[in-house]
Each structure stands twice: as structure tokens, then as C-alpha cells.
UniProtKB/Swiss-Prot annotation:
Zn(2+) 2 binds at residues 164, 167, 186, 189. GO terms for cellular component: cytoplasm. This is Chaperone protein DnaJ. Zn(2+) 1 binds at residues 148, 151, 200, 203. GO terms for molecular function: ATP binding; heat shock protein binding; unfolded protein binding; zinc ion binding. GO terms for biological process: chaperone cofactor-dependent protein refolding; DNA replication; protein refolding; response to heat. It is found in: Cytoplasm. Binds 2 Zn(2+) ions per monomer. CXXCXGXG motif repeats lie at residues 148-155, 164-171, 186-193, 200-207. The lineage of its organism: Bacteria, Pseudomonadati, Campylobacterota, Epsilonproteobacteria, Campylobacterales. SMART domains: DnaJ. Belongs to the DnaJ family. It comes from the Bacteria.
Length: 373
């Protein structure tokens, strides 16, 4: 047997409107998706609670439901209304009581004095690897917005606004998904609740005009991707004449040789196997030229060495990072007869005979004797 709307809200059939509203608040809060994330059962119950409330809070729909049942409502456009809100007014009042003041109500609408433009904005600036590391001068072209003086930033002819017909001055509209109604900012007035009856001819209803400008900027040493540099008083111009700031967001390119990690530089450097065995002072490239690395005898493949203060200067201080050199030992891929003979003699001089070194042979003998004992 199908559960009734009264049972869903846990009320009796003779409940008055205030009782229905209180019951809805309780059940909606209990099963709201924000409090039951990922719970499909709670989501389904929340939909039923909204469905029940939309019927029982409406005298006409409730009377039809009480007399003919749920099926009688389907043909009459259940879940919708001529105003397009589908019970939105009551839903907004209810949700405001436990999700913040003014949810879905006119108290959330913006003031017509609000700016149509933000005071600050961001522009991206691409730099080469070296420009970011060592700093540079860059000329930046940008576009900024200036609040329209003709309409005082309203976008309306002579600055005159009328109540938005879409949201009736609320600044929000109800959007239904099934039996659930959500509040969203009115797309026609952007939440102000008012709009122009006739657009300003100067700004075409935007409330602002755009202008182009350029500025030369000194990029400091050590900037990196994601960092922002503030340029004072180069932002948008607001109604009261104050001007915001422009933020320049750095996008630094990578390098084919060096890898940067904050203020440290990494490089993989090839070393011939004889250099690794014998040890040697070698020259390695750095971001400033080259430096000497004293390679110890018996250096291992992948071993890392630190060249202090050969990295990037910190953008906020005078500290300089390090360069980390990771060696990659290289072996010859082809040998002539003379080289082959020399290597064979070298191999024999280390006691390698019949393809096995004396130490390896001794180890095998120890293992064999262990099994015999």
C-alpha cells in the first residue's frame, strides 16, 4: 500500500497549515542532501517530503488529494504553478530558518547601488625560464572597465530602473528539479531585483565602458608560475571614482636542461664510466654559466651532488637556492679491437676468469659447502 502524504510528514489528516509547515521543516532538515551526502535513501525521502509539502500546503491541491488521491493531481499540472515558483515562497522561508538568513527570499537580493564590475582583475603574463629566474622588464597591454558615468553604472537610460519582471524584485528565481525547488540568482537582473526598462545608449546596458592601457612592469628575480604581482591603481574604476588594482599572474616556461623546484635547480649530467671509477673534477652547466664538481672515486649511477648557492634567488629575500646534480654513468656502446683487448686485460687483472670473479667463485663454494654440511 502506498504511503500517504500525511504519513510522510508524520502528521494527522486534520493537521492545520502551521503544523504542516513545522513537520516539513523537521523532515526536510532530517533528510536534506547536505546532511546526508551519498545517501540515496535519504535523497529519495527528501524528494517525497517536498512532494508531500507542496500538495498539503496548497488548499486546492490538498482538497483534491483528500477526495481523489494522488493520481488526480497528475493531470492538473502537479508540481507547477502559473507563477513559475511552484511553492517557492514557502520553501525559501523554510530553508532560511536553518541554512542562513534570506535563502530564497528578497532579503538576499543585491542593492541597485552594487557595482556591476569588480574593483580588481587578473591578467596572465608568460615569461621564459630565464626571465622568471633573473627578472626582466615587460610591457603589459590590458583592458580595464570604467563605471558608466551616463547612467551611473546602472545600465539604464537616465539611470532609471524598474522592478525585474522575471523575479518580481526578489533577485532570485525558483528552479524545479522534479519535486524539489531550488533558489538561484535571477539571470535577467543578476540578483539586483531591478533592471533597465531602456538600456543606456552609452554603455549598451552593461553599466560600464572598456578602455585599453599599457604599463611597464619590473619583474623581480625568482618569480615562478602561479605567483601574482600587484600593480596598484590599475584596476577597474568604480562609481565613486575609486580604482582597484591589477594583478599580474606569472606563467613561467620550462627549460630543456634545468628543472626548477622553488629556488633549487636540478640537472642530470652524463659521466663516463672511467670518470666515475677514478674520480675527477668536472665542469657542469649552471643557470649562471658553469661550476666545478669534484667527482669522488667510485661515484654511483644516480648519485646526487649539491652545488651550494647555484640556484634561484628567493623572490622575497636574498637567499639563493642550490643546484642538485644527478650523475648518469655512461658506458661505451661499441669498441675497437685495441679497446676490447685493454678491457679484457683489465678484467683479468681484477681476477675475473671464466666469466666469474674470484669473490663470486668463493661465494658459490661457501653456499655449496653449506648444503653439504
Amino acid at each position: 500500500m502506498e504511503i500517504s502524504y500525511y504519513e510522510i510528514l508524520e502528521i494527522t489528516q486534520n493537521a492545520d497549515k502551521e503544523t504542516i509547515k513545522k513537520a516539513y521543516r523537521k523532515m526536510a532538515l532530517k533528510y536534506h542532501p547536505d546532511r546526508n551526502q551519498g545517501d540515496k535513501e535519504a535523497e529519495d525521502k527528501f524528494k517525497l517530503v517536498n512532494e508531500a509539502y507542496e500538495v498539503l500546503s496548497n488548499d486546492e491541491k490538498r482538497a483534491i488529494y483528500d477526495r481523489y488521491g494522488k493520481d488526480a493531481l497528475k493531470g492538473g499540472g502537479f508540481g507547477s504553478s502559473s507563477s513559475g515558483f511552484g511553492g517557492f515562497e514557502d520553501l525559501g522561508d523554510i530553508f532560511s530558518s536553518f541554512f542562513g538568513e534570506g535563502f530564497g527570499s528578497s532579503r538576499r537580493r543585491k542593492s541597485s547601488n552594487d557595482e556591476k564590475i569588480p574593483s580588481d582583475f587578473i591578467v596572465n603574463l608568460k615569461l621564459s625560464f630565464k626571465e622568471a629566474v633573473f627578472g626582466c622588464k615587460k610591457n603589459i597591454d590590458f583592458t580595464y572597465k570604467c563605471s558608466c558615468k551616463t547612467c551611473n553604472g546602472t545600465g539604464a537610460k537616465d539611470g532609471k530602473l524598474q522592478t525585474c519582471p522575471k523575479c518580481q524584485g526578489r533577485g532570485q528565481v525558483g528552479v524545479s528539479q522534479g519535486f524539489i525547488t531550488f533558489a538561484q540568482t535571477c539571470p535577467d537582473c543578476q540578483g539586483i531585483g531591478e533592471k533597465a526598462s531602456e538600456k543606456c545608449s552609452d554603455c549598451k546596458g552593461l553599466g560600464y565602458n572598456e578602455s585599453k592601457n599599457s604599463v611597464e612592469l619590473n619583474i623581480p628575480e625568482g618569480v615562478d608560475t602561479g605567483m601574482k604581482l600587484r600593480v596598484n591603481a590599475k584596476g577597474n574604476i568604480l562609481k565613486n571614482g575609486t580604482r582597484g588594482d591589477m594583478y599580474v599572474k606569472i606563467i613561467a616556461a620550462e627549460d630543456d636542461t634545468f628543472i626548477r623546484d622553488d629556488d633549487d635547480i636540478y640537472i642530470e649530467f652524463p659521466v663516463f664510466f672511467t670518470q666515475a671509477i677514478l674520480g675527477e673534477s668536472i665542469k657542469v652547466p649552471t643557470i649562471r654559466g658553469e661550476a666545478t664538481l669534484n667527482l669522488p672515486k667510485g661515484a654511483k649511477d644516480g648519485q646526487r651532488f649539491v652545488l651550494e648557492k647555484e640556484g634561484v634567488k628567493d623572490v622575497h629575500s636574498s637567499r639563493i637556492g642550490n643546484q642538485i646534480v644527478q650523475i648518469s654513468i655512461k658506458f661505451p656502446t661499441s669498441l675497437n679491437d685495441e679497446q676490447k683487448e685493454l678491457l679484457e686485460k683489465l678484467s683479468e687483472s681484477f681476477g675475473i676468469k671464466d666469466g666469474m670473479h674470484q669473490e663470486q667463485k668463493g661465494l658459490f663454494e661457501k653456499i655449496a659447502n653449506w648444503f653439504k654440511s
